Amino acid sequence: MARRIIELDETWSAIEYTLRVFEEVAFEDGARPTAEVFSKATAIVYVACTQKPPNNLSADIYYRFSQHTNELAKRRKNQYGISRYARCATTLLNYLNRFYVKRLKLPEIENVVNAAFDAAAAADA
């Protein structure tokens, strides 16, 4: 039985929803995502990152995450919560971090978050 191909829009929709929940947790002390939501999102990341080329979405997810984080840093001037958000995002994108990022020697997910907030803070200064 062939595995279903997961498209970028479906993948990013699940990731973005979970990242928004993490944003509320980190910056507004919101409710944590349910285990079902979190496990579904991590499973989608895993499947999307292990699909055979040209359907492998690792590069697209990394790029979109970087863009999402830059936008988040511009919206959230408050530095409180950055480390919590970075930990949550790293956990969600663990598979991407462990294989794609390491193989291409890219900045790790936590470093992407910190760099985005540092750049936003420098732009405001």
Each predicted region: which residue ranges?
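Eukaryotic scaffold/interaction segments
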Residues: 1-125
